[in-house]
């Protein structure tokens, strides 16, 4: 990260940092509670569901990819991925042209469960979504979070934000909605062999 001139009044720095901490904590508490309630019927926790989502989006992610995209420690990504593998939801595989890295992909059961979780999403029980609806009604669109994205870009780097944007775009393109039902459109992008 580039060194910046942080010569700002201490009081301003503390107030900003505290405001960001409290707002982030309040939002996360709501997101976490709603996310847990959403996936509880599928016997998943947040890390497991997030890994399934990343595995779907990246379609052949390494543990490092999952840790990076999921903003989690490598050991957390590995341990929860192994639990999902034991449930038959993920497979560990190698690319034919890259035997060094192990890639994690959704199994058919994993893809099916992931789709079921998407179908079960209920915007009426997701408080952050409900909190943003008045802004959508007023401005015609949901908040785009440009200031927040700028802050995250300075913390995690441009590549993180580019991957984040690409995954959201891919997800929007890969999920089809018809008559209130979701369908995942994409298939594996490269041939895999079981990990040894």
Swiss-Prot record:
Q: Which UniProt keywords apply?
A: DNA-binding, Repressor, Sporulation, Transcription, Transcription regulation
Tell me if Isomerase is a UniProt keyword of this record.
no
Q: Which residues bind DNA?
A: 63-86
PROSITE patterns per UniProt: HTH_MARR_1, HTH_MARR_2
Q: What does this protein do?
A: Negative regulator of protease production and sporulation.
Give the quaternary structure: Homodimer.
Which protein are we looking at?
Answer: HTH-type transcriptional regulator Hpr
Source species taxonomy: Bacteria, Bacillati, Bacillota, Bacilli, Bacillales
What would be the name of the gene that encodes this protein?
hpr
